């Protein structure tokens, strides 16, 4: 999900540049290469590359004749793999940046705290649930709850923990995945 920030635009431009480079490589490929390399390319574009040879989508190899172009075909496959690897690295960089931005926007998480992606998502989810609870309760002090009145993990100070759990579980959107 995009936040609309400047860094999101930069990340998307980086991924698009890598995609354009791979398209140039694909358009320069000679005709006469095996169908296998084009099938691999289509799998990478769909975002669901097959893992190993024993996956659900087993395909029969069409009998191929050995030709002097096999060296060129191998080079084309290697270039295609390198382009796919570069796209995957760029995608992972974008994802890591998004998680680090999310971690820094969570209150009460020190910058040097090492959180897993799952912990970051859980904290963000509980923080959102807490904000929803505040809005639902509509118990503002002059229309505003100061952050000093909030305690870890995101509950209103002085409110019994059991009451908080009841409200959070009633408003939870994540279902069984939340703890």
From Swiss-Prot:
Q: Where is this region: Disordered?
A: 19-88
Query: What GO CC terms are in its UniProt record?
Result: nucleoplasm; nucleus; transcription regulator complex
The bHLH domain extends over 79-131
Expression (tissue specificity) = Expressed at high levels in lung, kidney, gut, heart, ovary and podocytes (visceral glomerular epithelial cells). Also found in spleen, large intestine, uterus, bladder and testis.
Q: Where is the composition biased (Polar residues)?
A: 30-49, 70-80
Which GO molecular function entries does the Swiss-Prot or TrEMBL record give?
Answer: bHLH transcription factor binding; DNA-binding transcription activator activity, RNA polymerase II-specific; DNA-binding transcription repressor activity, RNA polymerase II-specific; E-box binding; histone deacetylase binding; nuclear androgen receptor binding; protein dimerization activity
Q: Which UniProt keywords apply?
A: DNA-binding, Nucleus, Transcription, Transcription regulation
Gene3D superfamilies found in the cross-reference section: Helix-loop-helix DNA-binding domain (4.10.280.10)
Q: InterPro entries of this UniProt entry?
A: bHLH_dom, E-box_TF_Regulators, HLH_DNA-bd_sf
User: What CDD domains does the record point to?
Assistant: bHLH_TS_TCF21_capsulin (cd19704)
Q: Where in the cell is it found?
A: Nucleus
Listed under subunit, the entry gives:
Efficient DNA binding requires dimerization with another bHLH protein. Forms a heterodimer with TCF3 and binds the E box (5'-CANNTG-3').
Q: What does this protein do?
A: Involved in epithelial-mesenchymal interactions in kidney and lung morphogenesis that include epithelial differentiation and branching morphogenesis. May be involved in the organogenesis of the spleen and heart and in cardiac and coronary artery development. May function in the development and sex differentiation of gonad via transcriptional regulation of AD4BP/SF-1.
Q: Indicate what this protein is called per its UniProt record.
A: Transcription factor 21
Q: What gene codes for this chain?
A: Tcf21
């Amino acid at each position: 999900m995009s936040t609309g920030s400047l860094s999101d635009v930069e990340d998307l431009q980086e991924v698009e540049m890598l995609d354009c480079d791979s398209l140039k490589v694909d358009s320069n490929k000679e005709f006469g290469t095996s169908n296998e390399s084009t099938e691999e390319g289509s799998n990478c574009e769909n975002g669901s590359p097959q893992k190993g040879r024993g996956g659900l989508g087993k395909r029969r190899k069409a009998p191929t004749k050995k030709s002097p172009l096999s060296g060129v075909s191998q080079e084309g496959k290697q270039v295609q793999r390198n382009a796919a690897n570069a796209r995957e690295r760029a995608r992972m960089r974008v994802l890591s940046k998004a998680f680090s931005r999310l971690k820094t926007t969570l209150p009460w998480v020190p910058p040097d705290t090492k959180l897993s992606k799952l912990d970051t998502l859980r904290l963000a989810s509980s923080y959102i649930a807490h904000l929803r609870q505040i809005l639902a309760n509509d118990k503002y002090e002059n229309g505003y709850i100061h952050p000093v009145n909030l305690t870890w993990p995101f509950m209103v100070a002085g409110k019994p923990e059991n009451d908080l759990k009841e409200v959070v579980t009633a408003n939870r959107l994540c279902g069984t995945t939340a703890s």
